[in-house]
Design a protein with these regions (language model features):
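C-terminal motif of bacterial Sec signal peptides marking the signal peptidase cleavage site
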Residues: 16-19
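Bacterial N-terminal signal peptides that target proteins for export
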Residues: 1-8
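Short, linear, compositionally biased motifs with a strong N-terminal bias
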Residues: 11-14
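Ser/Thr-rich, low-complexity intrinsically disordered terminal regions
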Residues: 21-131
Length: 131
């Protein structure tokens, strides 16, 4: 009986861990997500607004300013869902930047699930326009 309980607990833990999406899966090069062009702002302004947007109902788990990458895990909402925010180029002053937002939830299917997060784009626009 005791061994059965241990096995059940181990199985439940592995199912739970297996259902979490890894932030490593969020890559700009995989063709997923949605891209937007941002003009009239510099890299620092975009970076600050991206951090605000990626902190709203999410916890930032990876951030690398030199490469323009922020990755967050959703706190309120779909458990295990992750979101990536990619800024290109990372030069300080260029005419326009491309912002790509990619999201993935555990056991996501391409047929039903969206691969980006509209609320992050809305939060980003609010943050960048409030400065």
């Amino acid at each position: 009986m005791r061994n059965s309980l241990k096995i059940i607990v181990i199985l439940l833990l592995s199912l739970h861990l297996g259902a979490c999406a890894s932030t490593d899966a969020l890559q700009l090069s995989n063709g997923k997500g949605k891209s937007f062009t941002v003009s009239g702002k510099n890299y620092e302004q975009i970076w600050r607004a991206a951090n605000v947007a990626m902190s709203n109902d999410m916890k930032i788990v990876d951030r690398h300013k030199p490469s323009g990458v922020i990755k967050s895990r959703v706190v309120n909402g779909t458990p295990g869902k992750i979101v990536g925010f990619f800024i290109q180029p990372t030069d300080e002053n260029v005419p326009s930047y491309t912002v790509t937002i990619v999201s993935q939830k555990p056991l996501q299917t391409d047929f039903v699930d969206r691969d980006w997060e509209p609320s992050v784009w809305e939060d980003f626009k609010t943050a960048i326009n409030s400065k």
